[in-house]
């Protein structure tokens, strides 16, 4: 049981900086201004469900996609590392606020004409929460844990769905309490947290690239 908690904790530490629910909260507040409370709650729930589904598909079908297109594990690590590092750099040195992003502007225009527009899948679930970096991390991690013997087989079966479920629940709770979070943390607080998470992502991305290069060297050495 202790191994299960360790696996879940490790998974959350890896995924939460990538998913970054606080930036999704800022985006949600920019898009849901014309929605009533019931509609905001519905969009929050649907976004969380979509995030859970995307992560599950990435974990269990990611290897099949890699095999279909002939993508190697080192190649995935390097590509995923580049994506994660790029996302981290953008969070460290933001060029525009989340509410000013093209997705937010286009969706805001749609909301003016259609108050009940669906923003749960795009952009809240993808690419804001379960974006390319998150998906690449999940696929690469799935390949790594299946090849290692760090955890028991039953832990590797139970932990991933629980991790994805907890990420979805954290996102749902953050979106449901988005107004309170903004009042408590403030825009400056969210920017500071985003920059800290961005630095962590840059470090993770660089380590991904290093691991991929080392695997290539071992393969051809």
From Swiss-Prot:
One Gene Ontology term, aspect cellular component:
plasma membrane
- How does the entry describe its membrane topology? Multi-pass membrane protein
Per UniProt, which keywords does this protein have? Cell inner membrane, Cell membrane, Membrane, Transmembrane, Transmembrane helix
Where is this protein primarily located? membrane
Where do the TM regions start and end? 8-28, 45-65, 69-89, 119-139, 155-175, 197-217
Spell out which residues lie on the membrane's Periplasmic side.
Answer: 1-7, 66-68, 140-154, 218-221
The family database entries (Pfam families) matched by this protein are listed as: MarC
Instruction: Provide the protein's localization.
Output: Cell inner membrane
Sorted alphabetically, which InterPro entries does this protein's record hold? Multi_antbiot-R_MarC
Topological domain ranges for the Cytoplasmic compartment:
29-44, 90-118, 176-196
Family that this chain belongs to: Belongs to the UPF0056 (MarC) family.
Instruction: Spell out the NCBIfam families in the cross-references.
Output: NAAT family transporter (TIGR00427), PRK10995.1 (NF008228)
Q: Can you say what this protein is called?
A: UPF0056 inner membrane protein MarC
**Gene behind the chain:** marC
């Amino acid at each position: 049981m202790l191994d299960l908690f360790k696996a879940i904790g490790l998974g959350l530490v890896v995924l939460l900086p990538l998913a970054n629910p606080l930036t999704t909260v800022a985006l949600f507040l920019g898009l849901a201004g014309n929605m009533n409370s019931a509609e905001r709650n519905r969009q929050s729930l649907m976004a969380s469900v979509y995030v859970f589904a995307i992560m599950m598909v990435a974990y269990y079908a990611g290897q099949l996609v890699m095999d279909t297109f002939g993508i190697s594990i080192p190649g995935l690590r390097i590509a995923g590392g580049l994506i994660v590092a790029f996302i981290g750099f953008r969070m460290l040195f933001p060029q525009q606020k989340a509410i000013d992003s093209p997705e937010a502007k286009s969706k805001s225009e749609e909301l003016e004409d259609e108050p009940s527009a669906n923003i749960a899948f795009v952009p809240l679930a993808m690419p804001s929460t379960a974006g390319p970096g998150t998906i690449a991390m999940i696929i690469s991690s799935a390949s790594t844990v299946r090849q290692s013997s760090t955890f028991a087989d039953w832990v590797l079966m139970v932990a991933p769905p629980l991790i994805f479920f907890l990420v979805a629940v954290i996102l749902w709770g953050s979106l449901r309490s988005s107004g309170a979070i903004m009042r408590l943390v403030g825009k400056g607080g969210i920017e500071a947290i985003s920059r800290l998470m961005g630095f962590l992502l840059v470090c993770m991305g660089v380590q991904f690239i290093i691991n991929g290069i080392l695997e290539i060297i071992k393969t051809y050495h």
